[in-house]
Amino acid sequence: DKVRAREARKALGDLGWAGVEFGQDMPATEFVGYDYDAIDDAKVLAIVADGEHVDEIVAGMDAIVVLDQTPFYAEMGGQTADHGYLCDSADESVENLEGKGNALSFEVNNVQKNKGDKYMHYGKLLRGSLKVGDTVTASIDTERRAAIRRAHSATHLLDAALMKILGDHVHQAGSLVEPDRLRFDFSHF
């Protein structure tokens, strides 16, 4: 939603939400989320905490983490972002996906993609410490993604139904796609 996006841009401050300054010296994040729900070899390229680039965060800190690759879908086009965890274990059990039983657990509650195609994982470090250069397991909440996919498909069905019933002049003007609801904006004449 707009408030969350504004807060995300505000959190970056002068670090360049547009991607001009933020991560200019690093490659774009590779999105692997169409093929994988979890990967165990994501490298931490950058960390931002309290509006500053930092080398390390410790438990209890809110931060933005940029990875070299990610299975997390970023918020865009009205579709909300994936949630999940960055952990230190390749164990894909439910406990690991919830960040339990690991020395390191970073809960991801928002993901934004900047103009430089860096995926910024917003969240809180629940346990341990996380450093630039660390390799982590990145795991999405698969139930949440499935619910978002259903809502996304519903927007396409709604668009087709409106065009069939009201005519070809109907056009989608926007949408909001979340796990538990969707909003479909359209123009009619």
For each feature predicted by the language model, list its residue ranges.
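A glycine- and charged-residue-rich anion-binding loop/surface
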Residues: D1-F189
